[in-house]
Regions:
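An acidic-aromatic substrate-binding cleft motif
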Residues: 214-274
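Aromatic-rich carbohydrate-recognition surfaces in CAZymes
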Residues: 280-384, 409, 563-581
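Extended amphipathic alpha-helical segments enriched in small hydrophobics
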Residues: 405-436, 531-541, 569-580
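Extended ligand-binding clefts on enzyme/binding-domain cores
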Residues: 283-287, 373-376, 383-391, 402-411, ...
Length: 581
């Protein structure tokens, strides 16, 4: 499987830059009207590929070595017939456009005629929300005075999205049949340098795309690079170990830009599992994923953005809170109640208040009404006699065995305590005490916490990394020296537990949803007193080229499921930061 680099900003994502060639396979934009992602693809060829010619002959880029400037801007350096070539993809903050920059240095002792540029084609537009379908609309390509080149757009009755290049005057473009090539030639003396910067803009229609590119041209590459690197540096999290710092910050920015973004058509902030179509349920919203995993890292690094996220959750997403998954506009995608997802907005709000000390958010009308809605839904899930609450689906989104989950009710305990304080309702604190007592009475068997029970004598011993019993101390439900919790963790991490992968190179917990060690389990280990083993496991896996995936092979550490798992990347960054402290 090829390795990929990624980058992007709020509006544009480049989710699949091939490491072997440097080519962009496609780009994605969020579209509120389409309720998900639109991907512009090249089909059997890349959307954008770097091209180098020496003496009129195409020279293959070889031995590409990649780095991520300030943990996010991908830069490759390689060789091509006596040239050292550097390729950079830069998506400046807040812009609907990006740079492709090619630099060449002549390492030979004779002059070289060098041409630097790109080649590409837009032959398909894909709509992605969990599933992928190809649009059967009309794509157009025509000359434009806005960029002195051409513009391309997808038309579905009205324009849906558009794509346009621009460059300095020396760059020459050829185009036709939804394909294009553009670049510039120069004679390079020995030791000489050359550079070409090509800009691509996106928009709902052609004028927006062309002028978005033109705006970047006016700003200039160096200014945009300086501002972007400065923005990233300000938000990077510290760690003494350089390897941990790199992994933490690369996953932080991957989550920041791929688990949230702004729509091309309405410019609204929205949240999703991943803006990469390489993730198997991309471009849809889960309360759990966005608020329990991605959000803790965001609130560490950008309080204003975290506040905007919560306002989005308590407006766009609150109507269907607790339901399995939703479109980015808040309407229902997959039905099915999940108790941990109902709790997620409250827990995220707590994280924001603790980090920022900004109680004013609690006075926002949408937050007040949203908390009331969460409480009213919670009431409908309460057992008629016992202070425990049921769920329909588990934290993996799979069907339950029994309806009363220990982990879920630990979250309910926390939520009731918080709502008691925020809503000034002492009765909720008493109910929280009742939940804890009921968990210890009904959800403990053989000296350990069970996974779930029907309250009629049946229970199961199990664990799921997306909602692990290992996290009970993390949420404050019990202490790490609680003998019941310690017994539970020993049991699910022991060789006797079939999904523990104990004594394998990656000895982290899996589950039936994906029967391999989960990266979320590594996160859980970092947070529950097993940081040393978790860091050792991380050292043995590349995950998805250094970025979080769902699960990895227990022996090789290769990605098994869920590549480009952006919300998980946020939780990994947060867990690494917590462990580094």
């Amino acid at each position: 499987m090829p390795a990929y680099q990624v980058t992007g900003n709020e509006y544009v994502s480049l989710p699949a830059i091939r490491e072997d060639t440097g080519a962009v396979q496609g780009l994605t934009v969020l579209h509120m009207g389409a309720k998900g992602l639109l991907e512009l693809c090249g089909g059997d060829a890349p959307l954008i590929a770097p091209v180098v010619r020496v003496a009129g002959q195409e020279a293959m880029l070889a031995k590409l070595r990649w780095r991520r400037e300030n943990a996010w801007v991908p830069v490759a350096q390689g060789e091509a017939q006596g040239l050292t070539v550097t390729l950079t993809y830069l998506c400046p903050l807040g812009e609907r456009a990006f740079f492709v920059r090619l630099e060449a240095e002549n390492r030979r002792d004779v002059p070289l005629e060098v041409w630097l540029g790109v080649r590409g084609q837009w032959t398909r537009t894909l709509h992605e929300v969990n599933e992928t379908i190809a649009l059967d609309g009309r794509r157009t390509q025509e000359a434009s005075g806005w960029n002195n080149a051409f513009v391309m757009q997808e038309v579905a009755g009205l324009p849906l999205c558009a794509f346009a290049p621009i460059a300095e005057a020396g760059v020459k473009w050829t185009w036709g049949d939804m394909a294009f090539e553009g670049g510039d030639g120069v004679s390079l003396a020995p030791g000489g340098h050359a550079c070409v910067e090509l800009i691509f803009g996106v928009g709902v229609e052609t004028v927006a795309a062309a002028t978005s590119a033109k705006h970047l041209l006016r700003l200039g590459y160096e200014r945009c690079l300086r501002q972007t690197l400065g923005w990233l540096k300000k938000r990077m999290l510290p760690a003494q170990d350089a390897t941990v710092a790199r992994m933490m910050n690369e996953n932080l920015f991957f989550s920041f830009f791929f688990a949230s973004g702004r729509t091309l058509d309405t410019e609204e902030l929205c949240l999703m599992t991943s803006r990469s179509p390489r993730y198997y349920v991309s471009a849809a919203y889960w309360d759990r994923d966005s608020l329990l995993w991605s959000f803790p890292a965001i609130v560490l690094t950008d309080a204003a953005y975290a506040r905007e996220i919560l306002m989005h959750v308590f407006t766009r997403q609150i109507r269907n809170v607790g339901q399995h998954s939703r479109y980015i506009d808040g309407t229902l995608l997959e039905p099915g109640f999940e108790l941990d997802e109902l709790c997620a907005p409250v827990l995220a709000l707590e994280g924001y208040l603790v980090r920022t000390g900004d109680p004013a958010l609690l006075q926002e009308p949408c937050v007040k009404s949203g908390l009331s809605r969460i409480l009213s839904v919670l009431e409908t899930k309460r057992h008629p006699e016992i202070e425990l609450y049921e769920t329909f689906l588990q934290p993996t989104d799979d069907e339950i065995v029994y309806p009363y989950l220990t982990y879920d009710n630990a979250l309910v305990w926390r939520v009731l305590l918080l709502l008691s304080e925020w809503l000034e309702r002492p009765d909720l604190a008493r109910r929280a005490g009742g939940v804890k007592a009921a968990v210890y009475r009904y959800c403990v068997r053989e000296g350990q916490f069970v996974w779930s029970t029907d309250l009629e004598g049946h229970y199961d011993i199990y664990d799921e990394p997306p909602g692990s019993l290992q996290l009970l101390p993390y949420y404050g439900f019990c202490a790490m020296d609680d003998p019941v919790w310690q017994s539970t963790v020993r049991a699910i991490r022991s060789e006797a537990y079939p999904l523990s992968f104990a004594h394998r190179p990656i000895a982290e917990i899996g589950c039936r949803h994906a029967p391999h060690p989960w990266v979320l389990s590594i996160c859980n280990s970092l947070l529950c007193g097993h940081a040393d083993t978790a860091l050792a496991h991380l050292a043995r896996t590349r995950m998805d080229n250094g970025l979080a995936c769902e699960s990895v092979n227990e022996d090789t550490g290769e990605c098994e499921t869920g590549a480009a798992f952006a919300t998980c990347a946020g939780f990994l960054a947060y867990a690494l930061w917590s462990a580094a402290r």
